[in-house]
């Protein structure tokens, strides 16, 4: 569901939900989201800006409160995950195995407020990193499906 419309996307099922993970590029395939965004340097820049905003902006306080005292581990894990999710190197899987996103997020209270703050923070990071607007919109749609699936509390 979420992968539909992403460039080069075939989709990938994670925990029963389709995500934007792309297939590896071939000579005949379209570029992946990983390619279109600019590879590892661009993904790292996006992740770093996302967590910088989470730390700085009061609008993301509820989201920040769900995280630990420091964001270093979260930065690395999201970077590793997004690289593979967008069709690049599978750094996360190589280190930790299958993402099991919902299971890994169950210990953290995630409701509509946290979901919406995550999405707003990522959208702001994509704008500030000047991600192509068409790609950013497609990623935002895929992020919504995954973020909504992470909810484990009301409100």
What are these regions (language model features)?
Residues 35-43:
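Long, hydrophobic N-terminal alpha-helical segment
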Residues 143-155:
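Short amphipathic alpha-helical segments at helix boundaries and their inter-helical linkers
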Residues 36, 106-108, 151:
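A short, structure-level motif marking secondary-structure boundaries and short turns
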Residues 1-17:
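Compositionally biased, low-complexity flexible segments
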Residues 23-31, 44-127, 133, 140, ...:
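Heme-based O2/NO sensor domains and their adjacent alpha-helical segments
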